Amino acid sequence: MEKQITINADDMICPHFDRVLFSHSLNKVLKGGRGSTKSSVISLQLVMDFLQDSHANVLVMRKVANTIELSVYEQIKWAIYMLHVDSLFEFKKSPYRIVDKRNGTAFYFSGVDDPQKLKSMVIAQGYVRYLWFEELAEFDSWQEVDMVRASFTRKHLPPGAHVVTYYSYNPPKNPYEWINEWVTQQEKLPGWYVDHSTYEDVTLPNILSQDYLDEINTVKANDYDYYRWMYLGEVIGLGNSIYNAELFHPLKEFPDDDDIMELYTGQDSGQQVSATTELCVALTRKKRVIVLNTYYYDPVGKVHKKAPSDIAKDLRDTEQRWIDKWGRHFYKQSADSATSDFALDHEMYKQYNQHYHHVAKTKKTKMIDNVQNLLATGRVYYLDTPENQIFIRQQRDYRWDEDTLQTDNPRVIKENDHTCDAFQYLVLDNLRDFDLKY
């Protein structure tokens, strides 16, 4: 005789979500701001539903497979432990699966790098009854998602059983992104339930820490539009200027009440074609991110342009001056992964046995989001020195191309943006150090 499991979910799922969870809709879209607990709610509901059907399987998907372990896999695992049913499961990582020891049904996890592969997925025990597309905005289009979804919804299930699909995401800023236009269409359709939640809907105690709420209020005070997007999940549009220039705080000198914990550099190189720049940035004990120095060489308009070997020597000498001035060696040196940047890297290695770390670039809008996120914390400073004027001027002048704003692929104006790129590579490469990734 199976032991009965008693679960009180009311202590874990905020009342806001009752309507979407108890809805009979087979497609449930949970969107909203960061900290709304929507992903936690879905994971708890999936585990509870899974336990009620001994033949049910769950397929959880992200766009890219290498994001699974530290996101949806751990999220489902967390829900299982929260519900005190971990003794029923075996946790596997190669491939990622969480298997019910009693009957062999499981939570399956997959990237959708190639939707065609999932179309031919076979489940040996039972049937796929629940789907979850997490971070839906990362997918390229609804067609990509629907190709996978339809592969499972078309299959015959026992009487009374249906495939239920969950979708969760934070809305992008751009109203012309496919997902923002798509959701307005889906919420009008029968069989669909669209829910929007924010951190303000988290009414149960001991879920959001006071430190997190303080962080939200800091962002709200520093950049209200960013707060509306990040934490309220509003589609605020892109505007024309990319950064709020007031969030780059000038300093006459390095603060007496703070200390450098680590030094970083960020580089964008164009060599003989366009400008090469490198930034020296400090992370301090008080979590400030301070741009200390800027190297900038622009060959445009010069008759005699520097060769890669000359730029390599410039950088080597400049970096040594920075090390001497600030009394620290660099913790990490980040650079673009473009061909020209590797050319400079090869020159540095040939002359000085030195390599840079070439970042795995994401979409431009995502790299910009990282910087905007950092700026919204109010922790970005720069030394107001002559050499840093090119840095602050380019950040202030950084613009979207107006001809691309009303599209799902907005582009920046690629002029005088080299320090912007260098700063983006540096931030992308150090998200965890800068408290932007947990």
Predicted regions and their residues:
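ASCE P-loop NTPase helicase motor core
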Residues: 138-214
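Walker A/P-loop NTP-binding motif
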Residues: 39-53
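Conserved Walker A/P-loop ATP-binding site and its immediately adjacent core
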Residues: 56-76
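ATPase catalytic-site recognition across NTP-hydrolyzing enzymes
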Residues: 204-270
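Mg2+-dependent endonuclease catalytic cores in nucleic-acid-processing enzymes, primarily RNase H-like
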Residues: 289-412, 431-434
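Inter-Walker segment of RecA-like/P-loop motor cores
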Residues: 69-127
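Walker B catalytic acidic pair
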Residues: 134-136
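Pre-P-loop entry segment of helicase/translocase ATPase cores
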Residues: 1-27
